[in-house]
């Protein structure tokens, strides 16, 4: 009997099988390994199909992989497409030495075709949402949906102009004073305003981040004039920074730790939510004042808020006041200031006195008293807990030239503030321009006087016009605002009713005002109106638009 050679071809074996027709036991086992489907499809047909189907499947798989490999590798110029035979070579299972081996679990996949490795790897976009810090969530919490920001956006998109856009939105929500500025002085003194003391080397070199000494001296003189010479300010206790918001934030950082809080009587500036909380982690506890008390602070209510916070485990580090008030424009009396100092001493907390409108006090009624004057004249007051914020941008109508001052009696706070202003310094051109503008006492006196007269005139005309429409305002003696009582126009005594009226004022009347809820007023229906940017010709236009809203509200009610 002829033996079957191990190296014979498959065709020879087939011929031998046909001739001999004799299949031994060992040969049967080998055939079943080579032809796995013979046991499924019986008979002579099973032998044929069991051989053809695996081979066809194998070659179709090779064709599929070859085609996809060509598509994947066509992006890499300079590489040749792999042939179908290379996949069966002895070295085809080894990792490609040109591939990176540093990816840990990817090392085992580097020998696979790219089409297979991509299937085995997790999708590139399966890592979930990219997280950000909790501080960002705090910033986004206020959102652009607040009426405070929505109104500003409407003004930006459709600003009123007497000639160019008479149907645009009139801005009555932002503290700006475009109608009076130092433009006249700039025109009269172009050399001093633009080039006096300036050079490329002068403005491009490093300067003290807390302000030039020459500017501090000029600011101290301006603050003395703004307070009607009631107190003399020491330039060495001044730290200059880029705006009142930056000053409030720096003081919040210096006086409180994350999780601590400040007491803030309300209604208050909408900006405190941003200035105090966003980056410091310090919280605000609002202390409500009511119209029945003319929105005056009550020491009893302050004391109650302090102890309620203490019971909740919140440490109160200070109180923030505005004098003149934002949004009401009222002034704090000497008695109020003394009571606040006693309260701060008894509770061992700080006082931040926001006096950014000190140079914009108008009217004959009331007297502006700076906290610095109280501290300067009283010997038994703990002055290290008193800190004052002053804003040159507001009083000088240089709102784009961000410049403000921290005036403190606490050396630790001053030292830390000087370092923190590295993140928010006043620009060199702004400093040199301000030095030229406010170093002349006569120029400062003339500007402050003109500013106060103009504010008083516009305020009086606006309040009288509102009164004719049945809208009363609280008495304002300082700043750019009047606090208008529109409770008679709201559809329901609620925040919802207040926002509905605000929408009508914005969309029907096309005027942007700030609803009291943005100022944390607990009584709905009050609105902050900024009048400083109005001219005498603008006031009748505003009155006509508010009258239109009043008629709409009355017809609907």
From Swiss-Prot:
EC number: 2.6.1.-
Residues modified to N6-(pyridoxal phosphate)lysine: 394
Organism superkingdom: Eukaryota
Transferase listed as a keyword: yes
Feature: compositional bias, Low complexity: 77-92
Keyword set, alphabetical order: Aminotransferase, Pyridoxal phosphate, Transferase
Keyword Transferase: yes
Pfam families on file: Aminotran_1_2
Tissues and organs where the protein is expressed, per its UniProt entry: Expressed in roots.
EC class (word): transferase
Family according to the record: Belongs to the class-I pyridoxal-phosphate-dependent aminotransferase family.
Subunit structure: Homodimer.
Listed name of the protein: Probable aminotransferase ACS10
Native organism taxonomy: Eukaryota, Viridiplantae, Streptophyta, Embryophyta, Tracheophyta
Gene, per the UniProt record: ACS10
């Amino acid at each position: 009997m002829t033996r079957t050679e191990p190296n014979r071809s498959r065709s020879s074996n087939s011929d031998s099988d046909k001739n001999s027709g004799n299949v031994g036991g060992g040969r049967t086992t080998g055939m079943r390994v080579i032809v796995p489907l013979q046991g499924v499809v019986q008979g002579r047909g099973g032998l044929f199909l069991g051989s053809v189907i695996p081979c066809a499947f194998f070659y179709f798989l090779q064709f599929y992989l070859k085609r996809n490999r060509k598509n994947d590798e066509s992006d890499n110029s300079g590489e040749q497409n792999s042939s179908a035979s290379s996949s069966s070579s002895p070295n085809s299972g080894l990792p490609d030495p040109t591939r990176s081996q540093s990816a840990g679990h990817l090392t085992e996949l580097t020998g696979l075709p790219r089409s297979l490795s991509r299937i085995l790897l997790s999708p590139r976009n399966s890592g979930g949402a990219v997280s950000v810090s909790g501080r960002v969530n705090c910033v986004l919490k206020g959102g652009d949906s607040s009426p405070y920001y929505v109104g500003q956006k409407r003004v930006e998109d459709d600003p009123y102009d007497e000639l160019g856009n008479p149907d645009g939105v009139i801005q009555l929500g932002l503290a700006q004073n475009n109608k009076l500025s130092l433009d006249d002085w700039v025109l009269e003194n172009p050399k001093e305003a633009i080039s006096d003391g300036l050079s490329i080397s002068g403005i491009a070199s490093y300067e003290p981040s807390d302000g030039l000494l020459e500017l501090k001296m000029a600011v101290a003189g301006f603050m003395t004039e703004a307070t009607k010479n009631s107190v003399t300010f020491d330039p060495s206790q001044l730290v200059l920074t880029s705006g009142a918001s930056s000053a409030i934030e720096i003081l919040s950082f210096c006086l409180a730790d994350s999780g601590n809080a400040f007491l803030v009587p309300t209604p208050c500036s909408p900006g405190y939510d941003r200035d105090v909380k966003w980056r410091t982690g310090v919280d605000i506890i609002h202390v409500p004042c009511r119209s029945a008390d003319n929105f005056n602070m009550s020491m009893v209510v302050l004391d109650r808020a302090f102890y309620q916070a203490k019971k909740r485990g919140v440490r109160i580090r200070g109180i923030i006041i505005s004098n003149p008030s934002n949004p009401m424009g009222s002034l704090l009396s000497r008695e109020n200031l003394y009571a606040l100092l006693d309260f701060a001493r008894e509770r061992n907390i700080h006082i931040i006195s926001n006096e950014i409108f000190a140079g914009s006090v108008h009217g004959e009624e009331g007297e502006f008293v700076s906290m610095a004057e109280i501290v300067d004249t009283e010997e038994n007051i703990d002055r290290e807990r008193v800190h004052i914020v002053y804003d040159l941008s507001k009083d000088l109508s240089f709102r784009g030239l961000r410049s403000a001052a921290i005036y403190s009696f606490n050396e630790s706070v001053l030292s830390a503030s000087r370092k923190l202003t590295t993140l928010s310094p006043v620009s060199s051109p702004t400093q040199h321009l301000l030095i030229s503008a406010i170093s002349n006492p006569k120029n400062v006196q003339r500007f402050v006087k003109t500013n106060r007269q103009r504010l008083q005139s516009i305020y009086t005309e606006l309040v009288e016009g509102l009164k004719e429409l049945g809208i009363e305002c609280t008495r304002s003696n300082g700043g750019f605002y009047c606090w208008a009582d529109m409770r008679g126009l709201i559809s329901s005594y609620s925040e919802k009713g207040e926002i509905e009226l605000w929408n009508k004022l914005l969309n029907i009347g096309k005027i942007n005002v700030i609803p009291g809820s943005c100022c944390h007023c607990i009584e709905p229906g009050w609105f902050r109106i900024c009048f400083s940017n109005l001219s005498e010709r603008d006031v009748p236009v505003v009155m006509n638009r508010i009258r239109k809203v009043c008629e709409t509200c009355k017809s609907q009610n």
